Design a protein with these regions (language model features):
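Long, low-complexity, charge-biased intrinsically disordered regions
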Residues: 1-162
Length: 162
């Protein structure tokens, strides 16, 4: 993958990710799960920018298709092209306000597959992310406003402990 052509985004917005219609092949599922687990570690530890793509693919671990493998390879190509990105923290002595943390939350309303919204939030301190989360909401929100409130509630619970 060192000489792979880099891409600008981990997921192609024009491709719809769908379940595999072909029965499961155990060897394929095992290698897919291994690579996906390694990418989940990277997403959780240092690269929150791939969290959505990795979480989306995790839903197909039991029966991955060649398309799902192709998307995993695309994420690797994205990582290869963005090696310079990472989390950095900076000390701001002159302006104490810069050392405070900031939080951002958002929601994506009603996934086409199961109508559940997705919550995402990130908290930043000294210029770097200190905690973040991306997860499917457990309820089916009836409006975008409701899904945003759920996202803010999740972020608020996390902020309470920071």
């Amino acid at each position: 993958m060192a000489e792979a052509n880099p891409v600008g985004m981990p997921l192609d917005p024009n491709n719809k990710i769908e379940p595999n219609p072909v029965p499961n092949e155990p060897n394929r599922s095992n290698s897919y799960a291994k690579l996906l687990g390694e990418l989940q570690y990277v997403a959780n530890a240092t690269r929150p920018d791939i969290s959505y793509a990795v979480n989306k693919l995790a839903a197909y671990t039991a029966n991955p298709s060649l398309l799902h493998y192709g998307i995993l390879k695309r994420i690797l190509r994205y990582l290869a092209g963005t090696r310079q990105l990472g989390i950095t923290y900076q000390k701001h002595d002159t302006d104490p306000g810069n050392n405070l943390f900031h939080g951002f939350a958002d929601a994506a309303f009603a996934n086409a597959d199961d109508l559940k919204s997705t919550t995402g939030y990130v908290f930043i301190a000294s210029g770097g992310a200190i905690t973040w989360k991306l997860k499917k909401q457990t309820i089916i929100a009836m409006s975008t406003t409701e899904s945003e409130y759920v996202a803010l509630s999740e972020a608020g619970r996390e902020a309470f402990w920071l």
